[in-house]
């Protein structure tokens, strides 16, 4: 699993070097190889190098298609652009695609959430991750003096997402994650099953021999 952060911001030369390092390890038993992408970084050249290096799952940060929400998060997503890129990704052989949806943004309404969840569903991802906005201390967001949405509305949004995705045959297998049958993330399940994992890179976490560490 390559991410979080935004590894897709690396240029092709940097990605080539990264995959050279990854190949130093025995990957013969790897069933799921995920790479996180910012939708704006996705190009044919990027997908080609991922396919060449056996990446078989993408996690794409859509977050929203609402201009006000995206402006608040300093992001950009256009539905038609995203749709074309996902078609291109599938045509190149990667069919296991997760899309992220952020909700509970200041001033967001349930109506806005419903509309954008429907757009996400039109893209037919195999997996959907939904995250409510969290205000972390000392971050730019926490210093903006914005007012979080009402907790009751946030709960209503969460319950709507849960029920809507269940009707669309997505299994709610983990707090924030929903998957079509057979597409539950092995990476996520590894955490939930309290299994071991190595974390490489700045700020990465790992869990070995009952000890959790942070770089």
Q: How does the language model describe each region?
A:
Residues 1-215:
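C-terminal scaffold of the Radical SAM
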């Amino acid at each position: 699993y390559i991410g979080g952060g935004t590894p897709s911001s690396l240029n092709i030369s940097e990605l080539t070097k990264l995959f050279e390092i990854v190949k130093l390890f025995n990957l013969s038993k790897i069933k799921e190889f995920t790479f996180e992408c910012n939708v704006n970084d996705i190009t044919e050249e990027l997908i080609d190098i991922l396919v060449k290096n056996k990446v078989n799952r993408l996690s794409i940060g859509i977050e929203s298609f609402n201009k006000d929400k995206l402006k608040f998060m300093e992001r950009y997503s256009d539905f038609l652009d995203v749709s074309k890129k996902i078609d291109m990704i599938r045509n190149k052989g990667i069919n296991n695609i997760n899309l992220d949806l952020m909700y509970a943004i200041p001033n967001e309404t349930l109506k806005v959430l419903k509309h954008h969840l429907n757009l996400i569903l039109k893209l037919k991802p195999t997996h959907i991750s939904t995250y409510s906005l969290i205000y972390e201390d000392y971050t730019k967001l926490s210093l903006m003096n914005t007012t979080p949405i009402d907790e009751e509305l946030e709960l209503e949004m969460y319950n709507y997402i849960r029920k809507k995705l269940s009707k669309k045959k997505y299994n709610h297998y983990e707090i924030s994650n929903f998957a079509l049958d057979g597409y539950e993330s092995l990476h996520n399940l590894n955490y939930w099953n309290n299994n071991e994992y190595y974390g490489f890179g700045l700020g990465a976490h790992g869990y070995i021999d009952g000890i959790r560490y942070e770089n």
